[in-house]
């Protein structure tokens, strides 16, 4: 699994964290001051990268959290058929299939020969945007 560990107190908006075994992008972080008996707490609001679900969790500020490694790669669309997009990675020349993105605007721009950016983390992949000003 492509993860590292980091302190919950170091999380920032826009960083990534694993919540409920799902890689998530941090939307908001709020910290509470330590009391007389107890450590500071960090409340993390995040959205799943692949499923879009919002998640919230509270950690002690010094707790270790898992941070996913999100690889941002480029691929070329080979074919679009039905609800499936066939892609070829431009570095490894590996071909693979992904479901058509849920965003109708992005899905309408996917044509054979177009380059796209896709994210890969924890064995999952997702088309994020088209490349090259299209």
Swiss-Prot record:
CDD domains: S1_aIF5A
Residue positions where Hypusine is found in the record: 36
Pfam name, any one: eIF-5a
Entry GO terms, CC: cytoplasm
Location, primary (coarse class): cytoplasm
UniProt keyword Glycoprotein present: no
PROSITE patterns in alphabetical order: IF5A_HYPUSINE (PS00302)
Transmembrane segments: none
Domain of life per record: Archaea
SMART domains: eIF-5a
Compartments where found: Cytoplasm
GO aspect biological process, one term: translational elongation
SUPFAM superfamilies, per database record: Nucleic acid-binding proteins, Translation proteins SH3-like domain
Protein role: Functions by promoting the formation of the first peptide bond.
Family matches, as NCBIfam families: eIF_5A, PRK03999.1
Protein name: Translation initiation factor 5A
Organism: Korarchaeum cryptofilum (strain OPF8)
